[in-house]
Amino acid sequence: DHVGRFGYKRSITVGWTLRLVFVLPLVAVPLLDGHINPQSQLALIIGALFCFNLIRGIASTAWFPWITGIIPERVRGRYLTRESAANNIGSFFALMLAAMYLGKDAVPHQFAGLFAFSLVTGLVSLWFIHRVPDAPAAEEDAQSKQPVKWSEIIRHQPFRKLLWVCFIWAIFMGGLLGFIVKFLKTGEGALADDRVLYASAAKFVGGLITLWFLYSRLDRLGSRPLMFLALGILGLVMAMWIGMSGGKIPVRFDWVCGVYFVMGFGFCTFYMSLTKLAMATVPELGKSHFFALYSVVGSLAVGIFPILWGILIDSLTSVKVNWLGLEWNQFSIYFTALLVVLVATAVQVLRVEEKKAARLNELVFDLLRNNPLREWMRR
């Protein structure tokens, strides 16, 4: 309720500054190895991560109304692709640096060094935040605690449909990357720690490709057709993980890198399309409240469902059933469940309302007409 009156930029700046305080325990815990018991170390880490994510979640409620206010609607797709590219480049180099620094057998003080590096880069990011202009809050947000009732927000049909997509997508994403790492490190054909990090970095390269792919398409074609494309790609990715965890496809480093690459492309395509659709769907009146609910629903699902998925995976530890040429174990069942969640997401995307969305056949025609292979064959 206070974001609009407090100011979008100010809310982000204060939130991002406070969250850095909780990086300090993450720096200290590895250095206390041998001085405090593992249970206390785990409690400190969980507490610090909880507070870090809580503050980040509160501050993030100002992010969407802020960028919606300063980025014109006609170029939001281009902005989001550039933002995604910057994020993927930074994440790629950070993960590569971590892989090279940690090596195969990391020791506790190395993790302290990584967290200290994160703290420094977080402080640097505040300088860039300071340079971004603020967006004026809507008059209703600035003067009233509750310009729109929560019941009216829920009854806003286009937003409610979008909220379902956000919620089910968060169910899919909750813990996914962590559980993939667990499979790659403990499953059959397990990879060394540094190779898992190198393979994980491939998803950021895949995400970077969206800069070329979506730069003009997101504004021209709309979000819905691109969301369907991303869901189809991610469905194939889940089929690959099912095959690997079920023993049908070998777990090889080059194959894993390829799957991560395609997965990164699918993630970024869907997320950017969903974000642009949210910015177009939320009305100007009470937009801080709409975006707050949107952020909270996604954050809660992303926070709760890793626990539920983890309980499911642990409960299936002893399951090993051969059927349809696959070994159905804890991971192959988990990836199959995610495939079902993707289908549910596609059903909800079908219900979403978008005024200027192209049809799927128009997307296919655009892909055939505007692709590098066609230009190369003309030469």
Question: Predicted regions: what is each one?
Answer:
Residues P30, G34, L95-G103, V181, ...:
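Juxtamembrane/transmembrane-helix interface segments of polytopic membrane transporters
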Residues D1-S11, G15-L20, L44, A48-D134, ...:
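Substrate-agnostic recognition of the 12-TM MFS/MFS-like secondary transporter fold
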Residues A135-W164, R359-R379:
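Juxtamembrane intracellular "pre-TM" segments in multi-pass secondary transporters
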Residues G15-Q39, G232-P250:
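C-terminal ends and interior cores of transmembrane alpha-helices
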Residues V29-L31, T121-P133, W241-M244, F331-R379:
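Multi-pass alpha-helical transporter architecture, strongest
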Residues S11-I12, L114, S223-L229, Y334:
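Juxtamembrane helix-start motifs in multi-pass secondary transporters
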Residues P225-Y271:
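C-terminal transmembrane helical hairpin of 12-TM major facilitator-type secondary transporters
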